[in-house]
Regions:
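Short beta-strand/loop motif that positions the catalytic acidic residue
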Residues: 258, 264-266
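Short alpha-helix in the alpha/beta-hydrolase fold that links the catalytic acid
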Residues: 260, 274-283
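Acidic catalytic loop of the alpha/beta-hydrolase fold
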Residues: 269-273
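Flexible "cap/lid" loop of the alpha/beta hydrolase fold
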Residues: 164-169, 177-208
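Conserved HGGG/HGGXW glycine-rich cap/lid loop of the alpha/beta-hydrolase fold
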Residues: 77-122
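Conserved alpha/beta-hydrolase catalytic His-Asp/Glu region
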Residues: 188-194, 202-257
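Catalytic histidine-centered segment of alpha/beta-hydrolase-like enzymes
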Residues: 296-308
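Active-site loop/oxyanion-hole signature of alpha/beta-hydrolase fold enzymes
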Residues: 117-151
Length: 323
């Protein structure tokens, strides 16, 4: 069983190496100090601190947008245009800029295009009803705008499911894909049964009616920092209205129809998507390869350096083994 200190360090994203470092420097962390850190984390000021980490600018990123049929899609181009093209897709609530360091690492070998999906980041919500095919259409719209005939796709969480949709509806456009800590239907969601989560069995829930979820508070502040606070409020209302219809809903037959080679990366300590579900997904996709990153949490797998290094290595080796 984890100690109070270990639970708090996990909450604050201080890993085992960090704990040993503190001990080696004779830094004494007593219970009062830990409680102070916890109070800080739950306070308004610390939500701002973590929000600032989600809006770090992407080094040498070029922001662009394309408008089509009532929706404006924002995207960021990073890396040498002569390198192989790679489209990156973020998770729910997040946006491209939230993955700045991860994208910069991908751009070492690829021309990366990070797309803010509808209602996320700086992209507008649009008026068309949500569908899995619509998200795939949006990605193809951006690819066509940039003249990308064929490309690689890397998606985290909801972005990994979007990859499945692109592979299903536009298999001729995707060379290979990478799905990180993702799922293929709602059964893969690890619901938090307490009344403070933003994903429930009845759909997305925001922080109205005295509900309190600090992840949402952090994202609220992050969106305000990029000038999209009002839009994000609208996005949350739309997501609440969709109920469970916004959740992934592919069947086994859908996965078996996918021919695109896909690397499935599992976060070993995923607290959002059930690892066993993601493993099962890899078995159902014919041309898939499975990698498990032991100890990695859902978001930490693409945010913490020790896990990021492993994931980037897997991606580079899978997409272009001889490169």
């Amino acid at each position: 069983m984890k100690s109070f200190r270990e639970h708090l360090f996990q909450l604050l994203h201080i890993d085992t190496i960090g704990m040993h470092y503190l001990k080696s420097k004779n830094i004494i962390i007593n219970r009062f100090t830990l409680l102070s850190f916890l109070f800080c984390f739950l306070s308004y000021g610390c939500t701002g601190f973590f929000a600032s980490k989600l809006v770090q600018p992407i080094e040498n990123g070029k922001m662009s947008q394309v408008t089509h049929e009532g929706v404006t899609l924002h995207y960021v181009e990073v890396g040498d245009r002569q390198n192989p093209p790679l489209i990156f897709l973020h998770g729910i609530l997040a946006f491209t800029q939230s993955y700045s360091e991860f994208i910069e690492r991908l751009a070492e070998k690829y021309f990366v295009v990070g797309i803010d999906m509808r209602g996320h980041g700086r992209s507008t919500i649009g008026t068309q009803p949500y569908s899995h095919e619509l998200i795939a259409d949006d990605v193809i719209l951006v690819a066509d705008e940039l003249g990308l005939d064929k490309f690689y796709v890397v998606g985290h969480s909801a972005g990994g499911f979007a990859l499945l949709s692109i592979a299903k509806f536009y298999s001729d456009r995707v060379i290979k894909g990478v799905s990180i800590a993702s799922l293929y239907n709602h059964e893969g969601i690890d619901y938090n049964e307490k009344n403070d989560d933003y994903l429930t069995k009845t759909g997305f829930m925001d922080n109205r009616n005295d509900r309190k979820n600090y992840t949402l508070k952090i994202f609220d502040r992050a969106y305000k920092k990029i000038g999209e606070g009002g839009k994000f409020d609208s996005t949350k209302r739309v997501m609440v209205g969709y109920g469970t219809s916004m959740f992934p809903s592919y069947e086994i037959s859908d996965l078996r129809d996918i021919k695109t080679p896909i690397l499935v990366i599992v976060a070993g300590k995923d607290d959002r998507i059930k690892p066993e579900h993601t493993i099962q997904m890899s078995k159902l996709i014919k041309n898939s390869k499975l990698e498990i990153v032991k100890g990695a949490p859902h978001f930490g797998i693409v945010k913490r350096k020790k896990y990021m290094d492993i994931v980037i290595g897997y991606i580079f080796n899978f997409l272009q083994p001889s490169a």
